[in-house]
C-alpha cells in the first residue's frame, strides 16, 4: 500500500483514468489501512481531472462508511459492558419461532470485549443481513468467540410442549452448553424462565448487543442449513427459499400433498 501511494505521488499525472480506477477498485478498505486510504484519497481528490478527483471522493466515502461501522459495532460491544463488572457476558437469541415446519434453534455466544480494536464488524440482526454476509460472519463469530453453543427443539417437541416452552428451553440449553459459564446472560426480548444464573432481557437486542447479534447470526445460519437439507428430501415445499415459513408455494404444497414429518401440526389447524 505504501508503495502504491509513493507511485501515485510520482506518476499520477501520467496514469489514465482507467488505470487509476482499476487500481482503486482492487483496494480493500479495512481497519489496517485506514491511514493509507486517507492519504491516497486526498491525493486523488487534488487531481485536476474531475473523474480522477471523483475516485478520491468515492474512496473517502468508503473510508467514512468503515469508520461509522466501527463506531456502530463498538457501541454494541460497549452496550454489553454497560451492565456492570461482569467478566463473561453471553448473548442468546432464537430463530424459527414462527415457521410451519422445522425446528426452533437458539444460540448463545460469549465475545471477548476486552479489545475494542478487534471487534467483529457488520454484525446486526440476522434478518437485516444478506445470506452470503450471514454465512461469512457466522464463521468469523465461531472462530473469534470465547465460547458459543447451539440448541434446538424439533417439530415433534414443539407440538407436544408448545412453542413458548420450546423457545425458553432452547435458550436455557444454549446457555448451559457454553464451555465458559457466563456471569451474565443477555436474552433477546424477554427474561429466561427458570434459568439458574444472572439474566437481563433486551428489547430488540440483536440490534443493540454485540453478543446477541452474533447469537442471532449463527442460529439463523445453522437453522437455514438444516432447512436446505430438508429441501433435498421434500423439494415441493420450497424449504430452500422459505426455510419453513408459510409462503404461498409452501401452503399450496401442504394442501396438495399434505404435511411431512417435520411440519408442526399444531401450526396447521387453520390451513388444513
From Swiss-Prot:
Cofactor binding note of this UniProt entry: Manganese or magnesium. Binds 1 divalent metal ion per monomer in the absence of substrate. May bind a second metal ion after substrate binding.
Source taxon at top rank: Bacteria
A single GO cellular-component term on record: ribonuclease H2 complex
Compartments, record wording: Cytoplasm
Catalytic reaction list: Endonucleolytic cleavage to 5'-phosphomonoester
Gene Ontology MF term list: manganese ion binding; RNA binding; RNA-DNA hybrid ribonuclease activity
Co-factor(s): Mn(2+); Mg(2+)
Keywords: Cytoplasm, Endonuclease, Hydrolase, Manganese, Metal-binding, Nuclease
Pfam families: RNase_HII
The EC number(s) this enzyme carries: 3.1.26.4
Residues bound to a divalent metal cation: 93-94, 188
BP-aspect Gene Ontology terms: DNA replication, removal of RNA primer; mismatch repair
Residue ranges of domain RNase H type-2 in the record: 87-272
EC top class, as a word: hydrolase
Listed CDD domains: RNase_HII_bacteria_HII_like
InterPro entries, A to Z: RNase_HII (IPR022898), RNase_HII/HIII (IPR001352), RNase_HII/HIII_dom (IPR024567), RNaseH-like_sf (IPR012337), RNaseH_sf (IPR036397)
Function summary: Endonuclease that specifically degrades the RNA of RNA-DNA hybrids.
Similarity comment: family membership: Belongs to the RNase HII family.
NCBIfam families according to UniProt: PRK00015.1-1 (NF000594), PRK00015.1-3 (NF000595)
Protein name as annotated: Ribonuclease HII
Taxonomic source organism: Clostridium perfringens (strain ATCC 13124 / DSM 756 / JCM 1290 / NCIMB 6125 / NCTC 8237 / Type A)
Amino acid at each position: 500500500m505504501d508503495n502504491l501511494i509513493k507511485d501515485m505521488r510520482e506518476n499520477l499525472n501520467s496514469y489514465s483514468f482507467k488505470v487509476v480506477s482499476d487500481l482503486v477498485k482492487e483496494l480493500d478498505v479495512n481497519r489496517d489501512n485506514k491511514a493509507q486510504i486517507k492519504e491516497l484519497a486526498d491525493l486523488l481528490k487534488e487531481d485536476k481531472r474531475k473523474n480522477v478527483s471523483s475516485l478520491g471522493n468515492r474512496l473517502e466515502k468508503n473510508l467514512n462508511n468503515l469508520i461509522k461501522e466501527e463506531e456502530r459495532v463498538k457501541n454494541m460491544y460497549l452496550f454489553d459492558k454497560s451492565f456492570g463488572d461482569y467478566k463473561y457476558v453471553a448473548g442468546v437469541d432464537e430463530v424459527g419461532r414462527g415457521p410451519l415446519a422445522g425446528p426452533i434453534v437458539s444460540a448463545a455466544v460469549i465475545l471477548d470485549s476486552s479489545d475494542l480494536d478487534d471487534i467483529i464488524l457488520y454484525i446486526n440482526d440476522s434478518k437485516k443481513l444478506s445470506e452470503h454476509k450471514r454465512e461469512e460472519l457466522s464463521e468469523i463469530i465461531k472462530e473469534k468467540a470465547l465460547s458459543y453453543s447451539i440448541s434446538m427443539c424439533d417439530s415433534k417437541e414443539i407440538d407436544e410442549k408448545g412453542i413458548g416452552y420450546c423457545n425458553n428451553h432452547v435458550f436455557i440449553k444454549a446457555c448451559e452448553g457454553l464451555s465458559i459459564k457466563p456471569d451474565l446472560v443477555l436474552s433477546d426480548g424477554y427474561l429466561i424462565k427458570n434459568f439458574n444464573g444472572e439474566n437481563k432481557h433486551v428489547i430488540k437486542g440483536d440490534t443493540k448487543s454485540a453478543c446477541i447479534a452474533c447469537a442471532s447470526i449463527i442460529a439463523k445460519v445453522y437453522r437455514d442449513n438444516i432447512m436446505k437439507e430438508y429441501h433435498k428430501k421434500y423439494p415441493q415445499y420450497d424449504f430452500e427459499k422459505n426455510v419453513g415459513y408459510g409462503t404461498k408455494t409452501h401452503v399450496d404444497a401442504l394442501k396438495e400433498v399434505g404435511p411431512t414429518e417435520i411440519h408442526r401440526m399444531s401450526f396447521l389447524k387453520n390451513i388444513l
